[in-house]
């Protein structure tokens, strides 16, 4: 039986049309494979994000019902309203103690979500911190929000006002950190806290279900709180979201710019335009309540949950502010005053 030579002759030339046909089929197969791979990866990522969102929601609900049990068991809260991509970034961040956070390098923190988290207490107990009467300092005070809600005005169908969950629009830059305060403990065990300095405000924007976006300054600036070793509450100043030199689209500002809209100089004093023309940077007032859930008497570390209610941005006095309810976890270090 003779063998058949399947090799093409040396002088054989493959037609150009045949080459283009083979290349086209190969490119089509490659594109189909890439699309299928991307679809599969997208489905996997989507499922992972949804799973993390469900875990975050369940954790937040547990915090609301029993904060001490959650902090004692898990150490920190991952809120339901770390919305969208924020959920994935923060859910991957590990719960770390203060010393563990300080030992991390820049590259270890970069793009991990850890920079926006507060330390946790690994060896703390769920009890009050017993302090003698005297003056103390609060350092490295950290507030990490887990939920932002906006109070909606009453409607014809629903006369009772309630807070609506929102979607976070800004990046993971809403955590307040490195805050210092003075603590005065009275002879009866009462606490008086006066906030002094630190990263005590963060510009934040959330979005309602209907698409409306609500900007506000999450803050505890100039907080004056009173209570005891178990819980304390107080009021704080809410600075204007915009400064006096900010100019609106019409070029109007508080300390600079036009007095009225350029196209309506004669109507500048009309009531309809007065609120837009007269810019105000006056501060507002917010309230906040802290509950202690975990302490470490040896290190002076203390942690718990908080809930604050404050007004939103007023667009320099042109809009009626909305009430913002912020819930989350906090951490601080207490030491005798120097």
From Swiss-Prot:
Concerning InterPro entries, the annotation shows: OMP/PagP_b-brl (IPR011250), PsbO (IPR002628)
Primary localisation category: plastid
- GO biological process: one example: photosystem II assembly
Q: Which domain of life is it from?
A: Eukaryota
- Extract the transit peptide range from the record: 1-93
Keyword annotations for this protein?
Answer: Chloroplast, Manganese, Membrane, Photosynthesis, Photosystem II, Plastid, Thylakoid, Transit peptide
SUPFAM superfamilies under this entry? OMPA-like
Which GO CC terms are listed, alphabetically? chloroplast thylakoid membrane; photosystem II oxygen evolving complex
**Listed GO MF terms:** oxygen evolving activity
What does the subunit section of this Swiss-Prot or TrEMBL entry state? Monomer.
Q: What does this protein do?
A: Stabilizes the manganese cluster which is the primary site of water splitting.
Q: Which family does it belong to?
A: Belongs to the PsbO family.
What's this protein's name? Oxygen-evolving enhancer protein 1, chloroplastic
The organism's taxonomic lineage, starting at the top? Eukaryota, Discoba, Euglenozoa, Euglenida, Spirocuta
What gene is this protein translated from?
A: PSBO
């Amino acid at each position: 039986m003779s063998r058949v030579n399947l090799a093409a002759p040396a002088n054989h030339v493959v037609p150009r049309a045949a080459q283009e046909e083979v290349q086209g089929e190969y490119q089509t197969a490659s594109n189909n494979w890439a699309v299928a791979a991307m679809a599969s990866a997208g489905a996997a990522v989507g499922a992972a994000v949804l799973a993390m969102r469900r875990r975050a929601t369940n954790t937040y609900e547990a915090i609301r019902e029993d904060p001490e049990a959650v902090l004692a068991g898990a150490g920190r809260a991952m809120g339901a309203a770390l919305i969208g991509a924020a959920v994935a970034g923060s859910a991957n961040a590990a719960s770390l103690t203060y010393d563990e956070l300080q030992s991390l390098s820049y590259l270890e923190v970069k793009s991990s979500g850890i920079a926006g988290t507060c330390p946790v207490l690994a060896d703390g107990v769920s009890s009050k911190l017993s302090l003698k009467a005297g003056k103390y300092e609060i350092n490295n005070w950290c507030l990490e929000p887990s939920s932002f809600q906006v109070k909606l005005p009453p409607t014809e169908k629903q006369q009772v006002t309630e807070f609506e969950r929102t979607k976070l629009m800004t990046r993971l830059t809403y955590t307040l950190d490195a805050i210092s305060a003075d603590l005065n403990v009275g002879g009866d065990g009462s606490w008086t806290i006066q906030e002094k300095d630190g990263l005590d405000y963060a510009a934040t924007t959330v979005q309602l279900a209907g698409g409306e976006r609500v900007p506000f300054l999450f803050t505890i600036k100039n907080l004056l709180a009173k209570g005891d070793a178990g819980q304390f509450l107080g009021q704080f100043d809410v600075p204007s979201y915009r400064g006096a030199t900010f100019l609106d689209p019409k070029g109007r500002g508080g300390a600079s710019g036009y007095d009225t809209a350029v196209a309506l100089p004669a109507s500048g004093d009309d009531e309809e335009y007065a609120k837009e023309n007269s810019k105000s940077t006056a501060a507002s007032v917010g309230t906040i309540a802290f509950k202690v859930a975990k302490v470490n008497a040896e290190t002076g570390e203390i942690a718990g949950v908080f809930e604050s209610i404050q007004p939103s941005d007023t667009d320099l006095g042109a809009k009626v502010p909305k009430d913002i309810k912020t819930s989350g976890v906090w951490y601080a270090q207490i030491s005798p005053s120097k």
